[in-house]
Amino acid sequence: SIFAIGYRSDQVANVKIGYGTLIPDSKYPISGILHESDIHQSKRCPENYRLFRLMVPHNRWNGNEESVLSCAENLLAGNPEKFVKIGEREIPRYKPGYMRKIAQMNTDCTYIGWSVSGVSITHVIDEAERIAEQF
């Protein structure tokens, strides 16, 4: 599952600006924290706020959203301004060589989307921003 959690910037001043954090320890329900408002050029949250995306694999938590919130508060800061489950997704999987095959295609058009730029939401958003800048 994917959660969004937002804070006033002063609440998370101790969290370094950056891409995010991987959490390999399976005792935590959160496997990764993406610093959404730090890594994207487009506005992700109001000024003086920071937005984080929490990646929560189903095999690492009991389905109780409070356990995710508690973990996030321990890792980031307490009392977030916003905490919401935004979806349940599975990362698409491709056979080895798929991206190389796509890169070698000769076409008269430009392809966009996760099937050609990468499967992470960050790749998709970066690609969308790149295309938007061309207009």
Residue ranges and their predicted role:
Residues 32, 67-71, 127-130:
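Alpha-helical elements of Rossmann-like donor-binding domains used by nucleotide-donor carbohydrate transfer enzymes
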Residues 53, 102-132:
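Short FAD-binding loop at a beta-strand-to-alpha-helix junction that anchors the flavin cofactor
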